[in-house]
Amino acid sequence: MLAYLRYNPEVFQGKTILLPCDDPEQSNFTKYFARNFERLGLRKLISTSYAGSGRPRQVSLFDGTVLDTPKRPYEPHGRIAVLDHAICDDDIPWNYMEGNGDFRSKEITALRDEADMILTNVPFSLLQPFLFWAVESRKQFAFIGNMNAITCNDTFPLLMSGQIWLGATQPKVFITPDGDHKSFGNTCWITNIDHGLRHEPVPLMSMQENIAHNERLRRILLERYKQNPNALHYEKYRNYNGIEVPILEALPSDYTGVAGVPISVLNHFCAEQLELVGCSVNADAKALGVREIGGEWIRAYREHGGTGNYTAHMHNLVLLTDGGVPIAPFKRILVRLKAPDTSGDL
């Protein structure tokens, strides 16, 4: 949230925020916006959760406090909290909803249509339907999702068209309700809210500068690709007109063709610097001109001990290096450098 505030200090000013997958009692999203309601200038905060997702509750007969028990009254109903002012403690008032709190229900969809922004940590198994539900609303949104899911056939076109992009940070550590810390390396923010990092170009060197000075690249060319140390170079794909760039910082500044880069490029993607051409592993690979792997590469791959589930008619990007090493790079994002804008130059 701080990245959006730094880029636009009034991003939340006068907004109604919907948190559609956030238990009013336990969600850190809810607590953050409830505590910072006035500072952010919110108009309204709505937090809802699915039936049965909250902490079991029962009122104690002895002291009137709420205790955790196995009993789950009113389980068919979701929970909702609606705030129009700050609440600085964790005792956020809430009520049961008429329905089960599923974000796809008419009840939650009506709240979506009322809101200005949708923010949450959606269950990863529901990421795609939630994404389409959010995009359909034409509202601003940001939610935590799985990095690999955004390159699927149905979701990647939203990236290509500029309807969504990745947030400024990668949430990697999560605190569970019992206090444990869980780490994930492939999570990201999926959003359509602008932030400053989207407009910061990645510093790049020329092809020759990378080969001479980029030690990570040199090590890959020597050790993984088995290249001649006196003739290091960027490898070309065997079945596509483009070069393989195994690490993002090795993208050459003087190469005008298509380059395949790791999916991590989406965390640093600057639309003013790069053109998004496509993804190497979804159904569009063939349409992009990626040819069949072919039997020769398959034979070399098997001879080198490869056990992956590849066939000659697949359209995955592959390399057959000058050192004779068959390589099938993991999921690649295809990009092309844009020409610098010199319209303002004298």
What are these regions (language model features)?
Residues 1-346:
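Class I S-adenosyl-L-methionine-dependent methyltransferase catalytic core
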